[in-house]
Design a protein with these regions (language model features):
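Non-catalytic, mostly N-terminal accessory regions of nucleic-acid modification and defense proteins
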Residues: 1-212, 216-217, 275-284, 289, ...
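Conserved catalytic network of the ASCE P-loop NTPase/AAA+ motor domain
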Residues: 220, 290-291, 343-344, 392-393, ...
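Conserved P-loop NTPase
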Residues: 399, 403-438
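Short, contiguous acidic/charged loop-to-helix segments that flank catalytic cores in large enzymes
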Residues: 28, 309-331, 356-364, 385-392, ...
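Conserved nucleotide-binding/hydrolysis micro-motifs of P-loop NTPases
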Residues: 44, 257, 285-286, 303-306, ...
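Conserved Class I SAM-dependent methyltransferase catalytic core
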Residues: 17, 24, 33-46, 328-402
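Hydrophobic alpha-helical scaffolding
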Residues: 152, 174, 252-256, 297, ...
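Conserved S-adenosyl-L-methionine
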Residues: 199-300, 305-323, 334-335, 354-357, ...
């Protein structure tokens, strides 16, 4: 459903206030540091309000408050069991965000209380199905850091200010056309990415690119059993797929521990139940999770041209063994492609963003590329994107689409969208219309002059499996023919104008006595 202008204004106002609150924490910290605190506090407020709602539902009709019920041992154990079943954790009454706000108002709050409370959330899940989704979730929010203040009093004062300001914000996460809280969290992640420089690519894919990837892997699907991102970052790309169609389960792997925590928070905050997502913290290529599984949709924006070991052991790894070559140590791009293809279901769709080098580099990469096209016929489309649309890098990128269910005579679609963008101050952007043009062209699989081309497998073979887009999409603009007669006439007119101007100048000089008659 489209959002109203009023809701759009509410969003903008909420975003403005959130970023102002985030700046209260800035101090001597860089963006990657104070990001952990502001996102952690927003998330803790969410957990608290979620728990309060569950407690209210569980006690409806009981004529007893949550605090009173918790004081009764029998009620308390029933409430714990109910909360664990419904949301995967529980929070004691005195540890709720709202309870701490009351402590701040009476000047009874201590930052140590918050530190203890977040540890208790994690330990409440021990031995439960939700344990892996919560353990270590707040490990990057170091409330004892001197960056927050030199002593407990200073740290308490700063965190109290942030908590009070957050408490004033209208986070509503039910009965709304738009997920205000989820949207606010995505806004914060995006803003932090914009200030994080080269590190931004580790955890965030711009929303318009995410939209393209998500629309591609959900094309023709009214639901997906599962979607998998092997380099899931903050989880935003996975969640974007859920905005396009119904997704039952989300799977991801992320090497960076801080980003892994962010992804789990993002899932929970978007009301994905703990049993409906599985995010793992490890190196995808070296220690892959989910072996033996395949997925309806596989989607990723992996680190570009990253290094990997390319160890000889991988020659017998079922992800890579059929290709005859391993991706080079200095560029893991094709290792990620091979990994993703291995996890793709026979009827699924895969979309991955990578630098243009994967289209034409030779040696081992050329062998792998040829195998995927000639032997397997998995390549569905190549989409060239504009330069400078990603955080942290200005290089042009492309989207590769793969399917295992292609027919032998299916063509491969090439789209050159490299010149379709809105120029920004520091970064280029894709408009909604430009995104829709890409998606519409992909769905129609049509050839459009100077924009797209549907190539046969034989044409690709004739190009020696080089996928460089200009080989297939001719964007050359012919210059208008030059009318030499008109050019000659223009030159005569210019000479005439020069002569007239010289006469005027000479006349003025004579009046001034500078130039005498000859």
């Amino acid at each position: 459903m489209s959002i109203t202008e009023k809701q759009r204004q509410q969003q903008a106002e909420l975003h403005k206030k959130l970023w102002s609150i985030a700046n209260d924490l800035r101090g001597n910290m860089d963006a990657s540091e104070f990001r952990n605190y502001i996102l952690g506090l927003v998330f803790y407020r969410f957990l608290s309000e979620k728990a309060e709602q569950e407690y209210a539902d569980a006690l409806s009709g009981e004529n007893i408050t949550y605090q009173e019920a918790w004081a009764d041992e029998e009620y308390r154990e029933d409430l714990k069991a109910e909360l664990i079943d419904q949301v995967g954790y529980f929070i004691e009454p005195q540890d709720l965000f709202s309870a701490m706000i009351r402590e701040i108002e009476t000047q009874d709050f201590d930052i140590e209380h918050l530190a203890t409370a977040i540890r208790k959330v994690e330990t409440s899940t021990l031995g439960e199905e939700s344990e892996n989704d919560f353990i270590g979730l707040f490990s990057d929010m170091d409330l004892s850091s001197t960056r927050l203040g030199n002593n407990v009093k200073e740290r308490t004062a700063l965190i109290s200010k942030v908590m009070v300001n957050l408490d004033d914000l209208p986070f509503v996460h039910s009965d709304m056309e738009i997920d205000m809280l989820g949207d606010a969290y995505e806004f914060l992640i995006g803003r932090f990415a914009a200030t994080a420089g080269k590190k931004a690519g580790e955890f965030y894919t711009p929303q318009q690119v995410s939209k393209i990837l998500a629309k591609i892997v959900t094309d023709g699907k009214d639901k997906l059993r599962h979607v998998y991102d092997p380099t899931c970052g903050s989880g935003s790309l996975l969640l974007r797929v859920g905005k396009e169609t119904q997704v039952y389960r989300y799977f991801g792997q992320e090497r960076n521990n801080t980003t892994y925590n962010l992804a789990r928070m993002n899932m929970l905050l978007h009301d994905v139940r703990y049993e409906n997502f599985d995010i793992r913290n490890d190196d995808t290529l070296e220690n892959p999770a989910f072996l033996g599984h395949t997925f309806d949709a596989v989607i990723a924006n992996p680190p570009y041209s990253a290094k990997w070991t390319a160890d000889s052991k991988f020659e017998n790894d079922e992800r890579f063994s059929g290709y005859g070559k391993l991706a080079p140590k200095s560029k893991a791009d094709f290792a990620f492609i091979q990994h993703m293809v291995h996890y793709l279901d026979d009827e699924g769709t895969m979309a991955v963003v990578l630098p243009h080098g994967v289209l034409f580099r030779g040696a081992a990469e050329g062998v792998i590329r040829r195998y995927l096209i000639e032997k397997k016929n998995y390549l569905e489309a190549v989409i060239g994107l504009p330069a400078n649309i990603f955080y942290g890098t200005s290089i042009p990128t492309c989207i590769l689409v793969f399917k295992k269910c292609r027919q032998q005579d299916d063509n491969v679609l090439f789209i050159d969208a490299s010149n379709d963008f809105e120029k920004g101050k520091n970064q280029n952007h894709l408009s909604d219309a430009q995104v829709e043009r890409i998606i519409d062209t992909y769905k129609r699989k049509e050839t459009i002059d100077k924009y797209s081309y549907s190539a046969t497998l034989q044409e690709i073979a004739d190009n020696d499996y080089n996928l460089n887009i200009p080989r297939y999409v001719d964007t050359f603009e012919e210059e208008a023919p030059i009318d030499l007669d008109q050019v000659q006439q223009d030159l005569k007119n210019i000479d005439k104008e020069i002569a007239e101007i010289e006469q005027e100048i000479n006349a003025y000089l004579k009046e001034l006595g500078v130039l005498k008659d000859e």
